[in-house]
Amino acid sequence: GFTHAASGHMAMELFKLEGSKCGPKDKDCKGLFMVGIPYRGGGPMMQDLLGGQIPLMFINQDTALPHVKAGKLRALAVSSLQRNALYPDVPTIHESGIPNFQALSWSGMSVAKGTPQPIVDKLEAAFRKVMTSPQTKQWLETKGFVVPEPGGAPYAKFVASEIDLWTKVIKTAGIKPE
């Protein structure tokens, strides 16, 4: 098998699970077997990748870009369903043969349950204003990020889908808290 690295290793676990699915026509399919290496963050992981101690990793596109441009790393695929503007010639994992694979790096703003609705509304309006401003969108897009539809309802739906996905990955991979 291969060794791989990821700070949280969840994207790689999803990759291993999805890449190991063999269809009925795949008589020679052996599955995908990899050994995870726990890291305490992307910095040490990147050093080991650049130093040749590990052969591959999942990392955010903005972190990898300077190393790709310098010729020190080769981007093999992006983990979104659409190609990334920073890497227009790099296929998606979906295009590379693992259907519907998607592992996104994302951030959002959340408040505690029970926060008074007027406060939620005020925060959401301010967040929407910032996220829809041309300056913010342009800055995020130059870093390779996709700006989603802002608002509590789309965000809650997205978070619920992420919880569902990663819960399945955790259970299927047999991941236990340490």
Q: Model-predicted segments: where are they?
A:
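Conserved, function-defining micro-sites of small-solute handling proteins
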Residues: 1-178
